[in-house]
From Swiss-Prot:
Keywords: Host cytoplasm, Nucleotide-binding, Nucleotidyltransferase, RNA-directed RNA polymerase, Transferase, Viral RNA replication, Virion. It is found in: Virion; Host cytoplasm. It comes from Rice dwarf virus (isolate Fujian) (RDV). Residues 690-897 form the RdRp catalytic domain. One of its GO terms (cellular component) is host cell cytoplasm. One of its GO terms (molecular function) is RNA-directed RNA polymerase activity. This is RNA-directed RNA polymerase P1. It comes from the Viruses. The keyword Nucleotide-binding applies. Residues 156-182 are annotated as: Disordered.
Length: 1444
């Protein structure tokens, strides 16, 4: 598509504006315009060589493009696209606006041309945390290279199928000789010295050029899912369409234009920005200047934030000027992001604290809104401890006036005043006057949403850099070495007041007592979901123990050769690793070596042995993993974060140590996860009582977790104290953890008889010992954790660190951090009560290293009291060896931040840290469909907190995903015996097509939820149904081939089981398998060893229980699938483990490539497919009437970091209050999850519910007995089976709540009052006689549709009338469950139609029992399954891998 046409830009702008202005009556027309835009942009992106021209065919088939290998053609196409981008930016913008900042931009470009060449970078600069700026090539040489590209003929040569090896070598030499060199000055290259703790010399040398280029490729890579140029174009044109009179102008794009002008010279065909990406977003490299990639990233991020957070600036001149000033500053100094962030750190903490007459007057002063309007919870009381079993918001009102002026003045201490002055000076020193003016607005108290908007606008700009990447070794050494020195001083007792003996004098006994008492409580069954398993149970559940909670393992590389091809799998799947290791994973001997530095180890060897080892290391014959095993060292990984933060170390725990912890402290973690089973009796954790402090007891994924703090801030009558400790893990000394483990051991020895006869692990270094009991595992782990050495590796540089503190990869990291934090908090509260006017702690919570304390503020009146609380808090953390910044220890009655949850005056908001385009690392997806479904999930999460227009943002996400959704298809030319590459774009409706269709991405149309089946059915079906036939053909099945083929290979002796598994056609004969791993525990294993371990773990008693239950069920005509039977658990577990394997992307091919290529010649009509064909329940539902509603809740808006439509939903429906479905449903599903996990099953929660219904056990004369038998057949465990059966019978309503919560949870409706009594104000279900629980399901279907309509109606509320096709429903219910022989006998052969207006039931002989047609619905009906709407469909994984 030629955008040079004078009418195309206004045409596109017009199309966008029509979509933005459309309402619910114009939804289908708006979607047609969207598809037209997608077509135009796809043609623009790929050129005019589309092989499908007819629009109807495009909707049905998609688009095909031939892909040229000619570098000149590719260069010309990208030059045209960049030219179009620049034309769009300048479109109808006055010349003075375009050139306003040209002097600054040209100065930036001049600075880029004057930075040192790469070979002038010093060794110290090369090792800096941030990659130094440097030039790769002189501009004139770069232009000469561009000319050389134009004369290279070989890149476009056709590769003949019968090309000889000599021809290949000659062709390769020609290409290398003529290929341009993009790095000047190779003659000036030199070798630099890098550290290597695993070399005898402790160092090695490498070329400076290689080191810098490797850093550049690693640290500048944004890990996009598609090429950024189309994203830039789409973002810019949407900003133009959405801004005032299309006048938006980007000075970031202007910078790119002037750079292109500078480097290209007069040749327009070379006028491209010198950063190279592949079509799939892969980073290829940069030219001329090192930091072009980060500048491009910042420009795209800036445009994206301006579009998606548009309500923060509303395209006002001042806000856009602030943004431009910060962007140009960052383009000039791309490595100064940390400096900018540091300059405003304290303003970020102490915003809105200064109380003055402007605050009291409640007017608008100099454009700033001081109106007093925020939520207030008048019933909130903090004069006594708050001890909730569950947290939920109370009713809130709108507060219009101040009532706590004393605290207003008390919190604004002289210290706080000084912090703010210093930050304002820091910004002034950066010469950013517009930013200075903006941040100055953050000082005064403004008790309404506008101050949050201004704060968020600042934080958006701090996130322009995306994911921060730097030199990991430099970052780690800076933090770890300094902290290690501090720790050694603390352990040595050099400071008489701050030392380990003083700390352990009070902490060690308390730690031991807590460990002892909680172990005792677990052993005595106080916490039903926490227990110490037997050794057989532990081994059979091993897949659960190595779920995502374990920090990681080394990668496992598997090469699988079949009769058709060779597959490569590179995985970190812990389940796969355990199944490859077998019982070896339980042997502690290989990892029990005393950790030593290599230099120290060599000194212990004889001269001859030392010389041989040094030679083996230097030659590479001694592998790194073997060397680290000998030295007892572990690995350090890394984690990148946003807002310019340094890279964080992630310590990789060996699996033997992880399993040891799972056996001894895992039950403690389980006891403190999920809601309380008992009413807390005090604030504090003692072991007997869990208290209220553990965040995990209240975690629901919502702001409910800290309701007391948010409600306290609404009243202004309580003080929140927020402790900000840095590097907590590194300052949490092992010496203070060991007492807790000693307490566990003491309780085990006193109370656990099974400790005498259960052997959980083995130590092959000890002969004649059958295994290790739990108490012995505690001793081993205490010895193991006393001192460790971890080795960090980055670009072949390696550094070893001695660790005597909490390493972050441990299973107990979050739990033990929380335990110590809670103990310190208690000590602080006791001292505050003694020293600060008897001020009492009302509530607190800890989440690992985060702590929040809420004190009763009634006795606080002076700044001196607040200062004293700060001093007490800081000193207690410092005396516990933690690093706490007094300047970041915020004490406020109105604001706070805890665990990334922010609040101000009862309003809640989230940091804009989610990156839309960038990823921390490459996607683990093995095909484009899976990758873009993951991207769709990111878009969905991003848009929920983006303060802009949800409709615009959702459209933006769909266009970005649609332009990235392409597949390369080779087409064989028989006449030339060559392959021509083709690029295929599926039908454009694949973007919103639900994920149940193989090629559907399931992105949201309304922004409310994913896979919006009902909305599509009602409004978009005409368009979507055209492409579903072809969308269903899009399939990448290499993963399925691998998993099925491996299952057939290892289970070849289980022919009946294989038959029941129905592995299908995706099966190839395995001829050979080889394994490699970088993990220390791996020593050349095979999946058969894992299978043997699982077989040995089968309990004979459970086996007999399971078999008997299967026989009993069979006698009632009920068959249990053999794949779920307890005796086949080892095989099912191995099969599920194989499903977690994903082949490398280069071997994951598009299975239907030939079929889709044949679409080019496909002449007959492609059939339409109904969207409900994969979701038949939605065929039952109709919206019979929609009436206008002119009623709003009249309540406040609490959730500020939500799109405009999200706030409209909250205004109309009412803000979240009371126990919502998330809480009830979450608790219900945990019963099933506990059963699955405690028995080591591989069935998912959904599959278990489906099995219950389809088996027919609910229709037995005694359904409770049937349930017990069914659960026993799966687990062999009588106790847990009886408990789950009782739960099903007693807690019937919770199943509807659970299914409903998965519709509400995670969506914007989560911010609203979604209780059924409130929902009925907006939805009516026209089925008065229908069973109530079934009615409720349909109420929530209508509720979601109500919200979707409101989003597309500009906030106009409607009453939704839901009608059900009763005949279809009756057929659906009959077809959803089998008819057993016993039921046929009861009912007779003639079947009467179901009467939906009554609770029709069959009378049976058993007293007080009856079977209703709707009984299964009361428990858990398949109608619930499609409501898992916001859960993206994934490849099948272990249940334990799905749940974090």
């Amino acid at each position: 598509m030629d955008l040079a046409r004078s009418d195309i830009i206004p045409h596109l702008l017009c199309l966008f504006q029509e979509i933005i202005q459309a309402n619910i009556q114009k939804v289908s027309e708006a979607y047609d315009l969207e598809l037209k835009i997608m077509n135009i942009l796809t043609l623009w992106r790929n050129g005019s060589d589309n092989l499908i021209s007819d629009n109807d065919d495009y909707m049905k088939k998609g688009l095909f493009f031939s892909r040229s290998n000619d570098p000149l053609a590719l260069q010309a196409r990208y030059a045209r696209m960049y030219d179009d981008l620049f034309k769009l930016n300048n479109y109808e913008v006055p010349d003075d606006v375009v050139r306003r900042h040209d002097n600054k931009i040209l100065d930036i470009i001049l600075k880029e041309s004057s930075v040192p060449f790469w070979y002038d970078i010093s060794d110290d600069e090369a090792h800096e945390s941030m990659l130094p700026e440097f030039r790769l090539q002189d501009i004139h040489e770069f232009r000469l290279n561009l000319k050389r590209v134009r004369v290279v003929p070989d890149e476009s040569e056709e590769i003949q199928m019968d090309e000889s090896q000599s021809d290949k070598r000659r062709r390769k030499k020609r290409m290398e000789k003529s290929r341009p060199v993009w790095l000047s000055g190779s003659e000036s290259d030199r070798r630099i010295e890098l550290n290597d703790s695993l070399k005898p010399s402790q160092k090695f040398e490498t070329k400076l050029s290689s080191y810098l280029l490797n850093r550049l490729m690693n640290e500048m890579n944004p890990h996009y899912c598609g090429h950024p140029l189309p994203a830039l174009f789409v973002t810019l044109i949407m900003l133009k369409a959405y801004s005032i009179k299309n006048k938006f102008f980007s000075y970031g794009i202007r910078y790119m234009e002037l750079v292109c002008n500078e480097i290209a010279g007069p040749d327009l065909n070379t006028r491209t920005f010198p950063v190279l990406f592949g079509s799939d977003g892969s980073f290829v490299g940069t030219r001329v200047y090192s930091h072009y990639p980060i500048k491009l990233r910042m420009i795209l991020n800036d445009l994206t934030y301006l579009l998606t957070y548009s309500d923060l600036h509303k395209f006002q001149e001042f806000e856009l000027d602030v943004n431009d000033e910060v962007l140009l500053h960052m383009l000039r100094t791309p490595n100064d992001g940390r400096q900018l962030k540091k300059a405003v750190t304290r303003l970020n903490h102490y915003y809105g604290l200064k109380f003055n007459p402007k605050t009291t007057d409640c007017g608008v002063v100099n454009g700033m809104d001081f109106t007093h309007k925020h939520p207030i919870t008048k019933t909130a009381d903090f004069t006594s401890p708050v001890l909730p079993m569950t947290n939920s918001f109370n009713k809130a009102e709108i507060c219009y006036g101040h009532n706590s002026k004393i605290l207003n003045r008390a919190v604004f201490t002289d210290t706080v005043r000084g912090h703010i002055r210093e930050d304002l000076k820091n910004v002034a020193d950066l010469d950013l006057p517009k930013l200075y003016e903006h941040v100055s607005k953050l000082v005064d108290m403004r008790v309404n949403y506008t101050i949050i908007y201004d704060l968020m606008f600042l934080r958006v700009m701090l996130n322009l850099g995306g994911y921060s990447r730097s030199n990991q070794i430099t970052d780690f050494r800076k933090t770890i070495d300094e902290i290690t020195k501090m720790n050694e001083g603390f352990l040595s007792g050099a400071d008489p007041e701050k030392n380990i003996d003083t700390l352990n004098a009070w902490m060690a006994p308390t730690m031991e007592d807590c460990g002892y008492r909680l172990t005792k409580s677990i052993l005595f069954g106080k916490f039903r979901k926490a227990k110490y398993p037997s050794d057989l149970e532990a081994k059979s559940n091993i897949d659960y123990y190595v779920t995502a909670r374990s920090a990681g393992i080394g990668n496992l590389r598997i090469s699988i050769e079949t009769d058709k091809r060779k597959y490569k799998v590179r995985t970190t799947s812990k389940s796969a690793f355990v199944n490859a290791m077998g019982s070896g994973i339980l042997d502690v001997n290989p990892v029990s070596n005393e950790p030593m530095m290599l230099t120290d180890y060599l000194l212990t060897q004889t001269p001859e042995t030392r010389a041989n080892l040094e030679a083996a290391i230097d030659s590479g014959s001694k592998s790194d993993s073997e060397l680290m095993r000998i030295l007892g060292q572990n690995s350090i990984g890394s984690r990148s974060t946003t807002a310019w933060r340094p890279v964080r170390p992630i310590y990789i725990n060996v699996l033997q140590a992880h399993l040891a912890q799972a056996f001894i402290i895992g039950p403690h973690i389980n006891a403190t996860v999920n809601q309380h089973e008992y009413q807390p009796t005090s604030l504090w954790f003692t072991g007997d009582d869990l208290g209220v402090g553990f965040a995990t007891l209240y975690q629901s994924g919502t702001a409910d977790i800290i309701v007391p703090a948010i409600e306290a801030s609404s009243t202004g009558k309580a003080l929140s104290v927020l402790a900000d400790c840095s590097s907590w893990d590194q300052t949490y000394l092992t010496a203070t953890m060991i007492p807790y483990y000693n307490g566990i051991k003491r309780a085990l020895l006193e109370y656990q008889q099974a400790d005498m006869r259960n052997f959980y692990m083995i130590d092959s270094g000890r002969t004649g010992v059958p295994g290790m009991k739990l108490s012995e595992i505690v001793d081993w782990f205490n010895s193991f954790q006393t001192k460790r050495i971890f080795n960090a590796s980055y670009l072949k540089e390696r550094h070893s660190f001695v660790v005597k503190y909490m390493w972050s990869g441990r299973l107990d990291t979050f739990f033990m951090n929380s335990v110590q934090n809670a103990l310190i908090t208690r000590r602080i509260a006791e001292e505050v009560s003694l020293r600060v006017s008897n001020t009492g702690l009302s509530w607190f919570q800890v989440a690992g290293d985060d702590a929040i304390m809420v004190y009763d503020g009634s006795s606080i009146s002076t700044t001196e009291q607040v200062t004293r609380i700060n001093e007490i808090t800081v000193r207690n953390y410092e005396e516990s060896n933690h690093i706490i910044n007094p300047q970041k220890t915020v004490i406020s009655h109105i604001s706070g931040e805890y665990a990334k949850i922010y609040y101000y005056a009862g309003m809640h908001f989230r940091d804009p840290s989610i990156q839309l385009h960038e990823s921390e690392k490459d996607s683990g997806a093995s095909d484009v469909t899976e990758s873009l479904r993951e991207f769709g999930q990111v878009i969905y999460e991003y848009n929920k907190r983006a303060i802009g227009t949800l409709r615009v943002n959702a459209l933006y996400g769909r266009l970005i995903a649609g332009l990235a959704y392409s597949v390369n298809c080779p087409q064989y030319d028989a006449s030339k015996r060559t392959y021509a590459n083709m690029k295929y774009y599926p039908p454009p409706t694949s973007v919103i097509a639900p994920a149940a269709f193989k090629g559907g991405l399931g992105l949201s149309f309304t922004g409310l939820s994913l896979n919006e089946v009902l909305f599509i059915k009602l409004h978009l079906h005409e368009a979507v149904s055209q492409g579903l036939h072809v969308i269903s053909m899009i399939s990448f099945e290499a993963n399925e081939v691998v998993s099925n083929s491996l299952s057939a290979y290892y289970l070849k002796d289980q022919k009946d089981l294989l038959r029941d598994m129905k592995l299908g056609k995706h099966l190839e004969k395995v001829k050979g398998i080889s394994f490699k791993s970088s993990d220390l525990a791996f020593s050349g294993s095979d999946f058969s060893q894992g299978l043997n371990l699982k077989r040995e773990s089968i309990d004979k008693v459970k086996l007999e229980v399971s078999r008997k239950s299967i026989r009993d069920l069979r006698s009632s005509g009920i068959s249990v699938p053999s794949t779920h039977a307890y005796e086949n658990l080892p095989y099912a577990s191995l099969h599920q483990s194989f499903k977690s394997l994903k082949v490398d992307r280069d071997t994951s091919k598009f299975t239907n490539e030939r079929l889709l290529v044949s679409l080019l010649e496909y002449k007959s009509d492609i059939p339409r497919v109904s969207v409900t064909s994969q979701y038949p329940v939605y065929d039952l539902i109709n919206i019979s009437k929609v009436d206008e509603l002119n009623v709003r809740s009249g309540g406040p808006v609490r959730f500020i970091s939500a799109p405009i439509e999200g706030k409209l939903l909250e205004e109309n429906i009412g803000t979240r209050q009371g126990v919502q479905f998330k809480n009830r449903g979450y608790g219900g599903s945990q019963e099933v999850l506990h059963f699955i996990r405690s028995n080591g099953l591989v069935i998912t929660e959904q599959a278990l519910i489906d099995l219950i219904i389809k088996s027919g056990v609910l229709l037995m004369i005694n359904p409770q007995r049937g349930l017990i038998d069914l659960f026993q057949s799966l687990s062999g465990d009588t106790a847990s089976s009886m408990h789950l059966a009782n739960f099903f019978m007693a807690e019937k309503p919770h199943w509807e709540d659970n299914a409903i919560s998965l519709t509400i949870a995670g969506s914007l409706l989560e911010n609203c009052d979604s209780r059924i009594e409130n929902v009925k104000n907006f939805v009516s279900v026209l089925a008065t006689g229908m069973q109530k629980d079934l009615q409720r399901m349909f109420y929530y279907v209508g509720f979601v549709y109500y919200a979707q309509r409101l989003i597309w109606s500009g906030g106009h509320s409607s009453k939704i009338f839901v009608s059900i096709d009763e005949d279809k429903l009756a057929d659906f219910l009959r077809g959803s469950k089998p008819i057993t022989r016993r039921r046929k006998a009861m009912a007779g052969t003639k079947r009467e139609p179901i009467n939906l207006s009554a609770n029709f039931s069959y009378e049976i002989s058993e007293p007080d029992r009856e079977i209703s047609e709707y009984d299964p619905l009361i428990l858990c009906h398949p109608l619930s399954m499609p409501f898992f709407g916001n859960w993206q469909e994934k490849y099948s994984v272990m249940q334990s891998d799905e749940q974090m």
